[in-house]
Amino acid sequence: MKNITDPFPCLGYWPSAGSFGFNTDILATNPINLSIVIGVLIFFGKGVLSDLLDNRKQRILRTIRNSEELREGAIEQLEKAQARLKKVETEADRFRVNGYSEIEREKLNLINSIYTTLEQLENYKNETIHFEQQRAINQVRQRVLQQALQGALGTLNSCLNNELHFRTIAANIGMFGAMKEKNN
């Protein structure tokens, strides 16, 4: 059988580590070197780390301040918006009340104007009816008078002869002459 370390030839050349235990040789364990490196890192790294932490702290504080300012601005804008909303609601209520009263007033004015117009139309109708009645009565009177005159003229023409006609004219002339003398 082959040796297990054959595929890893480098492992065969390493010496084995020995047992676990404390090495009391200070220079062999490098605690001094490690403490020096750690001390140098703490001494010089403390400033860099402190600067990084201070920068981070300043950024966080600046962000908090900006957030507070934004919050205060948002609260102020909210209060202004609420005040404007209340004002607009008040105006809307006033317009609504005034609008309703204006609508009622316009409605009453319209109703009154319609009644006035209806009364005027009724008066015009009555006047037109009265005028038409008077015209019809006048036409009937004229017609009756015309027929009466035609009838009287027909009667007179049939009854009168020249002698009666001359006597009537003479009598009328005599009456006019007497009236003329009285007036003088």
From Swiss-Prot:
The chain crosses the membrane at residues 27-49. It is found in: Plastid, Chloroplast thylakoid membrane. Keywords: ATP synthesis, ATP-binding, CF(0), Chloroplast, Hydrogen ion transport, Ion transport, Membrane, Nucleotide-binding, Plastid, Thylakoid, Transmembrane, Transmembrane helix, Transport. GO terms for cellular component: chloroplast thylakoid membrane; proton-transporting ATP synthase complex. InterPro entries: ATP_synth_b/b'su_bac/chlpt (IPR002146). It comes from the Eukaryota. It is a single-pass membrane protein. GO terms for molecular function: ATP binding; proton-transporting ATP synthase activity, rotational mechanism. In plastids the F-type ATPase is also known as CF(1)CF(0). F(1)F(0) ATP synthase produces ATP from ADP in the presence of a proton or sodium gradient. F-type ATPases consist of two structural domains, F(1) containing the extramembraneous catalytic core and F(0) containing the membrane proton channel, linked together by a central stalk and a peripheral stalk. During catalysis, ATP synthesis in the catalytic domain of F(1) is coupled via a rotary mechanism of the central stalk subunits to proton translocation. Component of the F(0) channel, it forms part of the peripheral stalk, linking F(1) to F(0). Belongs to the ATPase B chain family. F-type ATPases have 2 components, F(1) - the catalytic core - and F(0) - the membrane proton channel. F(1) has five subunits: alpha(3), beta(3), gamma(1), delta(1), epsilon(1). F(0) has four main subunits: a(1), b(1), b'(1) and c(10-14). The alpha and beta chains form an alternating ring which encloses part of the gamma chain. F(1) is attached to F(0) by a central stalk formed by the gamma and epsilon chains, while a peripheral stalk is formed by the delta, b and b' chains. This is ATP synthase subunit b, chloroplastic.
